[in-house]
Amino acid sequence: MKTFLGKKLWMASLAVALAAGSFAALPEMTSAAPSEPYTWKNVVTGAGGGFVPGIIFNESEKDLIYARTDIGGAYRWNPANESWIPLTDFVGWDDWNKNGVDALATDPVDPDRVYLAVGTYTNSWDKNNGAILRSTDRGDTWQTTTLPFKVGGNMPGRSMGERLVVDPNDNRILYFGARSGNGLWRSSDYGATWSKVTSFPNPGTYVQDPANEYGSDIVGLAWITFDKSSGQVGQATQTIYVGVADTAQSIYRSTDGGATWTAVPGQPTGYLPHHGVLDADGSLYITYSNGVGPYDGTKGDVWKLNTSTGAWTNISPIPSSSADNYFGYGGLAVDAQEPGTLMVATLNSWWPDAILFRSKDGGTTWTRIWEFDGYPNRKFRYTQNISAAPWLTFGTTPAPPEVSPKLGWMIGDLEIDPFDSDRMMYGTGATIYGTNNLTNWDNNEKIDISVMAKGVEEMAVLDLVSPPSGAHLVSGLGDVNGFRHDDLDQPPAKMFSSPNYASTESLDFAELNPSTMVRVGKADYAADPNAKSIGLSSDGGTNWYKANAEPAGTAGGGTVAISSDGSKLVWSTSDKGVHYSSTGGNSWTASTGIPAQAKVISDRVNPNKFYGFAAGKIYVSVNGGVSFSQTAAAGLPVDGNADLDAVPGVEGELWFAGGNEDGGPYGLWHSTDSGASFAKLSNVEEADSIGFGKAAPGRNSAALYAVAQIDGTRGFFRSDDGGASWVRINDDAHQYARVTTITGDPRIYGRVYLGTNGRGILYADPVGGNNGGETPPVSHSGISPQSTEFDLNADRQADIPVALTLNGNTLASIRNGNHVLVQGSDYTMSGSQVFLSKTYLATLSKGVQSLVFRFSAGNDATLSITVKDTTQVPLPEGSIRIEMYNGTTSATANSINPKFKLTNTGTAPLQLADVNIRYYYTIDGEKPLNFFCDWATAGSANVTGTFSALPAAVNGADHVLEIGFTASAGTLAAGQSTEVQVRFSKTDWTNFTQTDDYSFAASSTAYENWSKVTGYVSGTLQWGIEP
């Protein structure tokens, strides 16, 4: 996850001496604003949502496992509930860079000791030097030693490793391999002080991209490995190997405890060593790539060094000399229980998927986790269960040979449990995957891969809203788009899609019509020239559709606002200035009187009023964004952070938080006259984000929530009296580094939501507090997930695990209608987890099935299972086949968007102009209709749509959409397919009820043969059944 903090960063004065800073990580809070205890929890997404570059198993204690992230800190595995515990939430605003973890070492002699090398960037983005954090209680508390150079937890090569290691014979000794040409460093007092190993000859030469500031630094040392057999307990290990990011001489060895070093003779050259692992039999395995990762890598090899003879052997599953090698090698794991058993991962095989390779004979022969079985078909050695985070499909339905979800990408680290040959974990750009039956691979049985990231929440949050109805929270996120959070403690079933882009940069809802929402990001126009960077929702963020138009030539992004009644949009693009639309995004016109890249918001009462902020100036529009005028407001920050927000329910009331630490105004300002003037609050020294929530009992004004510094203390604060007084609502154990956004909840007094840059979304409530009228939630039992899928295809069937949160109750039964499932045959239990048998699931009918979990007390919980069948269906008679699914499957929607795949099953070319596809539906209120072709293989301009009423209404249909092609669409060769994605709506955008439509495919999420649409060639029915 490469996330640049686009804000001026605080620079604390850091000593460059090597002596340790002997202070606890959680100092006592100084006298400041009064505090109120809050309970803090992550909003659950279930997968993490960011890059996990390192997973580290302790070699001497089972189940002691750590994970490090690039911007979200470090975690420790909790075997009791198979989740991860965050260890660095104490990191605050000023020392935010400590959440970038470039290396982690767990002590193999004293398992209570653990060390982190922290620092986020080695360039100008990070003013702070790096540090070594050390703990004697497994990361519960930390002490810090500041280093005289920077550390790059979010820099290129961050999944190399580990750069920080503990001597397995004398655990007082640690080594750290630095970046930026700073070489090798050594500590002999448990990491308290450090000195440079001046005899080490090569600090590294490789630079990823000299022309780019982010990639222009020397990557440096990549990993360090001890040969434990060369030492004895209590004395320094004598033989040490170091991998360096250098394409000439990259592997160095010391045989005298680090006093002298030489390059290992005969070593391969030309590539960069990603990992080096020494097996118990004396074999040193090394993965190489022509890039340092995590995104690059187009060639690579795997080598083995016989450390006894000095012989090097190229053991690559697919060597770099092969035309089939289009990737490097990254992740490397050696089975401590079985010498000679190892695995490697591609870095990166983006298409059709990553590849894991496994060898049982030291790399002489390999098997791979998937292989082609008659292109485009693939044969899989695995099943994949994403029920813990169903959104990991990323909303895609790719055509073979691709599948969704994927095994992953950016697999720079892969580990086999040293105590359990069946357990393997690996990190990806989005989550941690793993298996508990790895050795099935060796018996030609499938391994079961599932998400193993419970507790990891690593997303970078760009925007949050809490509407007065619908879901309590909707998020805009970096890299994973965003979610509607219907249950804060359960993973969302899907991410935003249609439009689907990596990051939602800005999000808004209509205050007086909260189900109407808008979001913007940056679409991939290269992949889809018809893409749009703006999405709209009419159901509170459950479903989205792209606008029909956008400002000409824009790359998207920026900020967006919607009027209080939902009738008008104002979009400040990242590149083409500010534009407005009064046609629901069907057309856009440039606004006047406001500079490009201004931040825009809407008044929460007056539907014609919008505001903008740029370079210390406030702009207001009273005509729906058509024109803006600069107000007389003065004294606001010219640069730095800027958060302008309008108060719900009060026209013209604004708050502004912003400024920076480098000088100039910084703090919190208030306006009650639509931005004509602002008053600065004297009791707030610094502020970076402001939000609003339900008023306190007995109060009329909204509760205020701020990310701020008050009375010399940084934290999160609440004011119930319009900013006259503040209480701190976090403590020093819950700081979460840099917080990007804050908001309250308009329905729950005291509730606050935080968006962070790498620790996901947090929410909190007062401990034992009064929520101001909303009934506190009753503690019931629950299940996770609440929705999942099962494929009747025999090759893809797998048991479904369901985690129970019992809360003191017991499971009484599981029911499917009147049928009570039988434990032992229909399902099994292990602790608080249920495993639904694939044998039972295979008896279910296609469609949505509901299993009701009944407990000894409290409410039932329902698991919704979408049963599908991707088994090849015998084709009906005819020269064409039509597959279809609906892009929007909600019961009601203001647009219907079927997606078709048309295949020529005949033996001769087919003129597309002769083909007609019909979709049958009910009009649900006669109105004129609009037709849109969102995308088509043959070109959207070559697709036509015609509406007509049926001669007589039939069951499920009174109207039909006929889709045709122009002569310019050309021909479709025998055996080939073409795709058409269309959408239609009423001109007034009133809703259709889809559930009773003949052609509606309620449960399909990917292309399936669908007989309820019909296809004609030259007027003759060739596919489907007419209603």
Curated annotation (Swiss-Prot):
Gene Ontology process terms (BP): cellulose catabolic process; xyloglucan metabolic process
UniProt pH dependence: Optimum pH is 6.0-6.5. Stable between pH 5.0 and 7.5.
Signal peptide region: 1-32
CBM3 domain: residues covered: 876-1027
Alphabetically ordered keywords of this record: Carbohydrate metabolism, Cellulose degradation, Glycosidase, Hydrolase, Polysaccharide degradation, Repeat, Signal
One Gene Ontology MF term: hydrolase activity, acting on glycosyl bonds
Pfam families the record matches: CBM_3, CBM_X2
Enzyme class: hydrolase
The EC number(s) this enzyme carries: 3.2.1.-
BNR repeats: 134-143, 185-196, 252-262, 357-367, 537-545, 717-727
Alphabetized InterPro entries for the sequence: Carbo-bd_X2, CBM2/CBM3_carb-bd_dom_sf, CBM3, CBM3_sf, Ig-like_fold, Ig_E-set, WD40/YVTN_repeat-like_dom_sf, Xyloglucanase_GH74
Family note: Belongs to the glycosyl hydrolase 74 family.
Function: Hydrolyzes the glucosidic bonds of unbranched Glc residues in tamarind seed xyloglucan, producing XXXG, XLXG, XXLG and XLLG. May have a dual endo- and exo- mode of action towards xyloglucan, or may have an endo-processive mode of action.
Record's protein name: Xyloglucanase
